[in-house]
From Swiss-Prot:
It comes from Helicobacter pylori (strain J99 / ATCC 700824) (Campylobacter pylori J99). Belongs to the universal ribosomal protein uL15 family. Part of the 50S ribosomal subunit. The gene is rplO. Residues 1-64 are annotated as: Disordered. Keywords: Ribonucleoprotein, Ribosomal protein, RNA-binding, rRNA-binding. One of its GO terms (cellular component) is cytosolic large ribosomal subunit. This is Large ribosomal subunit protein uL15. GO terms for molecular function: rRNA binding; structural constituent of ribosome.
Length: 133
């Protein structure tokens, strides 16, 4: 047995699909594209989510969730965080560096027993302590 006698395993090599090469192939005339219409034309690509005229899934399902228009206040417990006590000046940017709170947060409220003692260090209008309004 030589290299010239080697063959691939039976069923491992598929015959390529040659479309539009005559009626005898079974894939002539319309070249497996069906009849006429938009999908038979070259360059046709359905939009993402298009379901052939049926109401798309993303429009059939109800909208969920609610993003309030009210201001978002982030609470930080001072008793659990010694790093805030060690700051000389408490600003919004310094608190953001310590606590990675989301960008949509508009204000910070310091809570806990020691929060009132830190009121003199606060240098930003967006920061309040418990007891302040």
């Amino acid at each position: 047995m030589g290299l010239e006698n080697l063959k691939p395993a039976k069923g491992s090599v598929k015959k390529i699909k040659r479309v539009g090469r005559g009626q005898g192939s079974g894939m002539g005339k319309t070249a497996t594209r069906g009849g006429k219409g938009q999908t038979a034309r070259t360059g046709y690509k359905a939009k993402r989510g298009f379901e052939g005229g049926q109401q798309p899934l993303q429009r059939r399902l109800p909208k969920i969730g609610f993003r309030t228009k009210d201001s978002h206040i982030y609470s930080i417990n001072v008793e659990k965080n010694e790093a805030i006590k060690s700051l000389e000046e408490i600003t919004f940017s310094s608190l953001r560096a310590l606590h990675h709170f989301p960008l949509y947060i508009e204000g910070v409220k310091l809570i806990g027993k020691d929060a009132k003692n830190l009121a003199s260090k606060i240098k930003d209008e967006r920061i309040k302590t418990s007891g302040q309004k």
